[in-house]
Design a protein with these regions (language model features):
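Glycine-rich nucleophile elbow surrounding the catalytic serine of serine-hydrolase chemistry
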Residues: 121
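Extended, subdomain-level signal for the structured scaffold at the beginning of enzyme domains
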Residues: 1-113
């Protein structure tokens, strides 16, 4: 069977998230997409990965490493899988009512909603 649809995986990052929680799962999806393509099992990339945050741009992780969010999470449309990173910054996100409200709305719009570690807000 040859895949026709590119599955969009969106990771929500936030300040002081764990960098492995953000990039680790995205690496798995990205590597899987390359493998499926190399085996001729897809006509287009099987997975497209994207990092989003409160605002587009650099987000400092708990290690001090920065990841770059392509867009603000509120601008996400058409995600198939939505993941929320974990890390020591999750406690501040528990007070981010606009993010929590957006995640609740997304739960009925995405195929999968998941979290990594403490990202289960």
């Amino acid at each position: 069977m040859v895949r026709e649809h590119t599955h969009r995986v969106v990771m929500v990052a936030f300040p002081d998230a764990q960098v492995l929680d953000v990039v680790g799962p995205l690496e798995v999806f990205s590597r899987t997409a390359r493998l499926l393509e190399s085996e001729g099992r897809t006509r287009r990339p099987a997975y497209a990965v994207e990092i989003v945050a409160d605002e587009a741009g650099a987000v400092a992780m708990s290690s001090g490493v920065e990841v770059v969010a392509a867009r603000a999470w509120r601008d996400v449309r058409g995600a198939d899988t939505l993941l929320v990173a974990g890390g020591i910054g999750f406690e501040a996100q528990l007070q981010n009512e606009s993010l929590l409200s957006w995640l609740r709305r997304q739960s009925s719009r995405v195929g999968r909603l998941g979290s990594i570690c403490t990202g289960a807000l």
